[in-house]
Every structure is written in C-alpha cells, then in structure tokens.
C-alpha cells in the first residue's frame, strides 16, 4: 500500500462521519458573582473545560454565560445524540447543540447512565446525518482509530488519529464540577489526542463506524487517553427504546477483581474471583445496607467465586458479569468466607 492509499482510508472515514459530529455548549445563569471563582481565558479551568466563564469582563448578576463545552454525535436522524455524562452532568445548566452546519438546537438530556460515563441528549430535528455504530468487541491492539470533537472547547470538529493501545483498562475520573469520582472499568486506551472539549465525541474505525466515546485523559501524561466501548452505549440506547430510561441492575457491593498479584499481596486463598471490600473514599462501605447483596448475607472480605454457576475468571470485574443480567433476575452466588464455601441467592434491583 502506497502513501496515497494509506492516507485515503482515514480521510474517507472522516468524511463519512464528519457531518454527524456535534458541539455541546454549556450555559448557566449566574445569580451573583460574589465569591465566584473566575478563570481568565489563558488559564485552564481545573473543572475540566478550557473555556472561560467570561470574555474580558465578569458577568453581571442574572446573566447567562457559557461555562463549558463538549462534543457528541448523532445516532438517530430524529436528533438522538450520544455524549459523556460528565459533559451534561449539571442539572442546573442549559445545553445548546451545534450541528456541523452551524445550526443551534436546545439540547434535552434524555438519560444519564448510572454506572458509565454515557449520556443521551435529544434535539428537535429531522433528517440529521447519522454515525453508524460498530462493534467494540472486535477491536484489536494496534488498530487504527480516529477521534473527532470540539478540541479544548475552542476548535470545532478537530480530527486526530492513533491506535488502540490497551483494552479493559480501569480508571477513576472526576465527574462534573463537584469533584465526585467515577470508577470506569473495561474502557479502551488509545494514544489519540483526547482533551477537554472533545470528550463525548466519537472514536471511529477506518470504516467510519463509532467504536467508542472519547471520555478521559491522564493529566500530565502524553498519548494516554480513554474511550467508552460503544457496545455499552448500544445497550443504553436499547433501554431507552424499551423503557424510556437507562436501566441497570444493582447488587449493592464494592469488589476488587482478583489476580495472582493480589493473591500474593494480601495472602488470599484464590487468584480469581471478586473480593468484597470498601474503597478509599470517606464513609465507603463494602456492602450497601438494605441492598440485594446485604439481604443475601454477603459480608466484607468475602470472595465471590461464581455467578450463576460460572466461575469468575482472573482479572474480571463482577460488573461485567452483571451486565448480562436484568433487573428482577435472580442471581446465585458462590462465596468463600475464610475457608467455608457458601451459596446464596438474591434478586437484582434497579440502580438509581
């Protein structure tokens, strides 16, 4: 393949999806500026967007101002848009969607995924260009991918190219301006230039299909970005079609996927399964009181070894197995408590 042919593939992929990428502008009414923290345009906003809440002069009382921006992409011609939850996290904000042709629409947040950095936004429009959704389970390390989005909140529909650098990564990222941390497991790692502003935009393959949603970076690191696998979003879209909301099963515990390293470090009986344990957050609990897990009698330091008779493999998160189940399903768990094996069962609830 000569250089012309090599360049043609990403060029054609970008042409195919470019019309379906949107910018999302975040605006808020500022009732007072007393005590407010204002970020000059030349300094990055530590809350995650490099957009200043004022242009040269502070806002006056009651004025609506732009406080941030992100990206998204159209998945249905009637105005259904995928983006990141952290882009549209603020329930007090107003969201304006700017399509590739420069038209502006009021954006209504239809749903926010309770366990992933995914949100669905709706605009009132017809016959919009749509980006096809690929299959994120068929990705391979080294595969070429392309990110498109509202780079740094300033440069609309910027394009960058790279590869899939890793699969099934686990990260913790700040969600919104309140500093709440969200733990994302099973995300894609890429060396594509992902930054504040192009979060929520599509990560596409050379066929012009979205295989991920750009979501996070590691500040201070070069060429390390992360994306949500598109198959997670497909399930959310199916839920919205069926129920009008995103529905996720809830067991009610925190757990650590086990491997040989953790087995040796903590002198555990097994190198696979899910260790029920609280995390580092203040007031964290391993088992949520009153939850299905609590009613089943699961306790901190239990090791869950099997789910519905299926052994939990090494380095496998329990959440990945729960994704196969639905609200209202009975779940049978085998647990190891000290040296005693126990079998329990409970009914999954809807995560709120």
Residue ranges of model-derived segments:
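C-terminal recognition in membrane/secretory proteostasis and scaffolding
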Residues: 11-12, 85, 235-352
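Serine-dependent protease modules
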Residues: 1-265, 271-272, 350-352
């Amino acid at each position: 393949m000569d250089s012309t042919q090599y360049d043609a593939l990403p060029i054609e992929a970008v042409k195919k999806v470019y019309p379906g990428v949107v910018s999302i502008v975040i605006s808020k009414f500022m009732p007072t500026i007393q005590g407010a923290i204002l970020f000059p345009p030349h300094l990055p906003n530590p809350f995650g967007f490099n957009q200043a809440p004022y242009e040269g002069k502070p806002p006056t009382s009651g004025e609506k101002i732009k406080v941030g921006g992100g990206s998204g992409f159209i998945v249905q011609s009637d105005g259904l848009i995928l983006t990141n939850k952290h882009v549209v996290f603020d329930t007090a904000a107003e969201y304006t969607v700017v399509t590739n042709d420069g038209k502006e629409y009021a954006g209504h947040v239809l749903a926010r995924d309770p366990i992933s950095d995914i949100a669905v936004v709706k605009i009132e429009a017809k016959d919009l260009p749509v980006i096809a959704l690929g299959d994120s389970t068929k990705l391979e390390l080294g595969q070429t991918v392309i990110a498109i989005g509202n780079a740094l909140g300033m440069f609309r529909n910027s394009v960058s190219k790279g590869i899939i650098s890793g699969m099934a990564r686990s990260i913790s990222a700040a969600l919104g301006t309140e500093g709440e941390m969200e733990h994302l497991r099973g995300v894609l790692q890429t060396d594509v230039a992902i930054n504040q502003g192009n979060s929520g935009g599509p990560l596409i393959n050379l066929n012009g299909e979205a295989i991920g949603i750009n979501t996070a970076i590691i500040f201070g690191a070069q060429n390390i970005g992360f994306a949500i696998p598109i198959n997670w979003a497909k399930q959310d879209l199916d839920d919205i079609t069926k129920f009008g909301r995103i529905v996720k099963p809830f067991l009610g515990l925190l757990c650590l996927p086990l491997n040989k390293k953790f087995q040796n470090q903590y002198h555990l009986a097994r190198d696979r399964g899910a260790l029920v344990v609280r995390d580092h957050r203040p007031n964290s609990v391993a088992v949520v009181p009153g939850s299905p897990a609590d009613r089943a009698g699961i306790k901190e330091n239990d090791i869950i070894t099997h789910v519905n008779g299926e052994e939990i493999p090494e380095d496998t998160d329990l959440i990945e197995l729960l994704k196969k189940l639905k609200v209202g399903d009975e779940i049978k768990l085998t647990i190891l408590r000290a040296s005693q094996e126990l079998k329990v069962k409970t009914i999954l609830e809807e995560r709120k």
